[in-house]
Amino acid sequence: MKKIEKIKRVKGELRVPSDKSITHRAFILGALASGETLVRKPLISGDTLATLEILKAIRTKVREGKEEVLIEGRNYTFLEPHDVLDAKNSGTTARIMSGVLSTQPFFSVLTGDESLKNRPMLRVVEPLREMGAKIDGREEGNKLPIAIRGGNLKGISYFNKKSSAQVKSALLLAGLRAEGMTEVVEPYLSRDHTERMLKLFGAEVITIPEERGHIVKIKGGQELQGTEVYCPADPSSAAYFAALATLAPEGEIRLKEVLLNPTRDGFYRKLIEMGGDISFENYRELSNEPMADLVVRPVDNLKPVKVSPEEVPTLIDEIPILAVLMAFADGVSEVKGAKELRYKESDRIKAIVTNLRKLGVQVEEFEDGFAIHGTKEIKGGVIETFKDHRIAMAFAVLGLVVEEEVIIDHPECVTVSYPEFWEDILKVVEF
């Protein structure tokens, strides 16, 4: 349990931890490449360590420094693991590594913690089977643990109906070791870090935005070359502080080196649409990814907003903190087309609705989202996080700006993506 009290102001600057999506991919592509890859400023958290441990278990040599990780690439020639591979709480690790393991002519078993064992895997297992991998598991391969025997893959064309970046990434990385061309079609573009990074590692990736959706193609047999990858600050982690500065009584916060990839900046677009005071400075591009410093100041009134299904992929991880902003807005805000939230570390729709109602906010729940009636009368109370890091951090921000005391249960769950969250809050607020 952690007690949260109201702040007087926000101040100073912060470089939140590096982007989780980019860190996972840098570690994995570094292992798949030939030669060495230097990953600068990686996020070291529960999820990314799960990826590193699995790579080590299939005999990747890794040297971990304070601000960098050096990976000796194996050019897709891994060794059969002695033991079960554990993705812990990380869906990204489980799904992308399924694609990598499918290229290997050996047997492996992939599992996860209790939460991950309940998350759907068929979305990645089915296309990998179609490519030729032999995969079995609980509920016909839909739930971890799954057993994989890979090798001899052939390219396929696959319609990725959920626009899942994890599925797309798994298929592209499997496609590099498949015969012919592998093509992924999405109704709308999901986060594109894998495509950008594959190009950084020297692969040719063809992207075609078309009427029937966004198409990504990769030709089998290409070799990745080790390189240097710089990891910018995670926009999902920065979002909590941008929201805090927006709702604070006074002050300003500068958030440094925040990733502004157009497939990931939906939260900031919505914050601007709500009337947020945010400016972007020092814009630049490193390792094929755009970033900038954000300066955020408080505003008195927030306008309500609607999030449509096609906007959801650009802000899926920020919906809990966006919901907190919506609770303070002047009117009714709505999120639709976000059913995917029910299959995250917790059922996030249920978690958002339950906790906001507990604090006196009127909320309507839909199968694929919710509607929030903004109010100035938000009460205190005990937040049930469902051990979900994003729920804990979102409601911590709420607790810092309401009069009554808010208590967060299982505050330690933030270590999944942001181990220093509680310390960082103290750096930028005055009570």
Curated annotation (Swiss-Prot):
The keyword Transferase applies. PANTHER family: AROM/DEHYDROQUINATE SYNTHASE, PENTAFUNCTIONAL AROM POLYPEPTIDE. It comes from Aquifex aeolicus (strain VF5). InterPro entries: Enolpyruvate_Tfrase_dom, Enolpyruvate_Tfrase_sf, EPSP_synthase, EPSP_synthase_CS, RNA3'P_cycl/enolpyr_Trfase_a/b. Its EC number is 2.5.1.19. Keywords: Amino-acid biosynthesis, Aromatic amino acid biosynthesis, Cytoplasm, Transferase. HAMAP family: EPSP_synth. GO terms for molecular function: 3-phosphoshikimate 1-carboxyvinyltransferase activity. Signal peptide: none annotated. 3-phosphoshikimate binds at K20, S21, R25, S164, Q166, D317, K344. This is 3-phosphoshikimate 1-carboxyvinyltransferase. It catalyses: 3-phosphoshikimate + phosphoenolpyruvate = 5-O-(1-carboxyvinyl)-3-phosphoshikimate + phosphate. The active site is at D317 (proton acceptor). Phosphoenolpyruvate binds at K20, G91, R119, Q166, R348, R390. Pfam families: EPSP_synthase (PF00275). It is found in: Cytoplasm. The keyword Transferase applies. It comes from the Bacteria. GO terms for cellular component: cytoplasm. Pathway: Metabolic intermediate biosynthesis; chorismate biosynthesis; chorismate from D-erythrose 4-phosphate and phosphoenolpyruvate: step 6/7. Monomer.
